[in-house]
Amino acid sequence: STLTGHLIYKCGGIDQRTIDEYEKRATEMGKGSFKYAWVLDQLKDERERGITINIALWKFETKKYIVTIIDAPGHRDFIKNMITGTSQADVAILVVAAGQGEFEAGISKDGQTREHATLANTLGIKTMIICVNKMDDGQVKYSKERYDEIKGEMMKQLKNIGWKKAEEFDYIPTSGWTGDNIMEKSDKMPWYEGPCLIDAIDGLKAPKRPTDKPLRLPIQDVYKISGVGTVPAGRVETGELAPGMKVVFAPTSQVSEVKSVEMHHEELKKAGPGDNVGFNVRGLAVKDLKKGYVVGDVTNDPPVGCKSFTAQVIVMNHPKKIQPGYTPVIDCHTAHIACQFQLFLQKLDKRTLKPEMENPPDAGRGDCIIVKMVPQKPLCCETFNDYAPLGPFAVR
């Protein structure tokens, strides 16, 4: 959060007076070093614990892009929120701490860094920037050796997880606190020849937007705004959303008309893929809508709930073998729903994805299986081929 907050501040997303106010209040609480993090950690509870719980959305502009930052939690208790944030992103910035012991803990068997990188890959993110952060740490002292060690280890770990292009990613030595290598190259690390963070962001290619497909918008939150009414919010994944449209909220059959669409407090004539929007609907109360519902156009391939679906599942890490009947919570787009693994149909070779065994009795770490899955509550998901953002899911 400190790195992200500093980036937003430097790009003019927040003024100096607010930063000064945050610094004063953070110092009073004995947390002066958290002032930039406070840009994002708006919740009082988060400030007092010094960790990120919710997903903060913030907008800033670079020379090339308007960027929406989704600051997702890195703390284990809040992994569900982290998954929701990741499922809305085009690219990821993975922040690893350079401090002795801190980096090693993150990439250990159950470490956060490894888990986040795995989830980002599973949820369909293709491109990543890695910030080797806290280079100003008293033990690290902007050391090239420490940076090289972390870069080498991260490349190896990312490849093992399934990031085939890990060698092409930018690995940037940064300090969220001092601002080194955020907006411009740092004179404290003359040995580093790559881009600073803002240039790396501008060097990313914007993904192709599926505007030609029917509308799909998974709901992230639902608000009641006085004088306006019920406002669901989320990211348009495919298609377009515009005032006057009749939309359905799957897996229910509730239909409503869109009155207005807003992004970052500006009204839009229409929103397309990648836009994080809030929209006002007629005739529905906040209690009628839930996070995880999917919005679609009533007249154009509207989304529906599914009673069961067939999925390819890779067991990344599980203490013991799983068998049919196993019922974990799955995170699919913004939905979090218990889902039973009813039948194991096939076991596949992980490299070729060719069937190795029909109806395997169980599956363990490293296995790739085809499973018939039954949601325990209504769920709207789609095949990866038809609507790629609504196909991937993570099992926890």
From Swiss-Prot:
InterPro entries xref list: EFTu-like_2 (IPR004161), G_TR_CS (IPR031157), GTP-eEF1A_C (IPR054696), P-loop_NTPase (IPR027417), T_Tr_GTP-bd_dom (IPR000795), TRAFAC_GTPase_members (IPR050100), Transl_B-barrel_sf (IPR009000), Transl_elong_EF1A/Init_IF2_C (IPR009001)
Organism domain of life: Eukaryota
Keyword Nucleotide-binding carried by entry: yes
UniProt keywords, alphabetically: Cytoplasm, Elongation factor, GTP-binding, Nucleotide-binding, Protein biosynthesis
Binding site for GTP: 71-75, 133-136
SUPFAM superfamilies, alphabetized: EF-Tu/eEF-1alpha/eIF2-gamma C-terminal domain, P-loop containing nucleoside triphosphate hydrolases, Translation proteins
A GO MF term: GTPase activity
Record-annotated tr-type G domain positions: 1-211
Subcellular location as annotated: Cytoplasm
Key word Metal-binding present: no
Primary localization: cytoplasm
Pfam families: GTP-eEF1A_C, GTP_EFTU, GTP_EFTU_D2
UniProt GO cellular component terms: cytoplasm
Matches recorded under PANTHER family: TRANSLATION FACTOR
Protein task: This protein promotes the GTP-dependent binding of aminoacyl-tRNA to the A-site of ribosomes during protein biosynthesis.
Protein name as annotated: Elongation factor 1-alpha
Organism: Giardia intestinalis
Lineage: Eukaryota, Metamonada, Diplomonadida, Hexamitidae, Giardiinae
Gene: TEF1
